[in-house]
Amino acid sequence: VIEKYDLKIKGKANTGLALCGDEYKIRLFILENIYEQLYLNFPLGQIIREKLYDFQERLSMDALGFGFFYRFFVVMIQRMESGHTIKKLEPKYEELYGSSAYMIVDEFLNEIEQVKGYKISKEERLFLSISVAGMRTPANTAEIEQKISISEGVADLIIEILDRIKAELNVTVVANELFDDFVYHVFFMINRLKYGFHIYNPMVDDFKNKYSVAYKMAEIAKGVLEERVGIEMTEDEM
C-alpha cells in the first residue's frame, strides 16, 4: 500500500520502524489507511474541542463534512507536536492561498494558536485548507454557499456534462433546484482529486449493477472532467 504514496519503511522490528517520505504523503497515508488505529481517541483537550465544534456550527457542516475536517486537524496537530511539520508543498497547493477555504481555516487556526501557544505555519494552514476545499458535500448546501465561493468554470463544466449526456445517451437531465448541490459536489470532488486525497466508496459495485444508466452518465462526466480539468477521476468518486 505504501508504494503508491512513495513511502518507505525504515528500521527493524526489534529496534523501531519509521515511515519515511514526503510529510504530506505520510499524512495522506495515515488519513486514508490507519487513522482509526492511531487517533481514534486522540486527546485534544476541552478548549480545542469546543473551538472545533464552534467551527462546525459557523460553517454549518454536517457530520460527514466535519468528520473530514476533524481528522485532518488531529493528524496536523499530532504530527506538528511530534516534530513532523510540512516544510514545503508542491505549487498546486499554493493555489489554495487566499481562497475562501484558506481564509476560513486561517481565522480558525489563529484561534488555535492562542490556545496552543505556538505558531502554525502557512504550509500547515494550506494542509488543513484541503479538508475544507475538498470536503464531503453537505446534505444542504444553502448555508455553505455563503462561505465557500466557487468559480464560474465549475457551473460551465456541469452544463457541458449535461450536454454530453444528452448527445450520447439521449437523456435530458433538467438543471433544477439540485443544480447548485451538484455544482458544489463537483467542486469539492475536483479539489480532492487535484490535491491527491482519496475517498473510498464501498458502494461502487452495487451502484454499477443496480443503476447502470446513472453509472453510464457518471462515466460521461468522468470523460468531460478528465478532458477539461486534466485530473484522473477514480472509480470511487464516480
Describe these PLM feature segments.
Residues 1-238:
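A cross-family "folded-core" feature that marks the main globular domain of proteins
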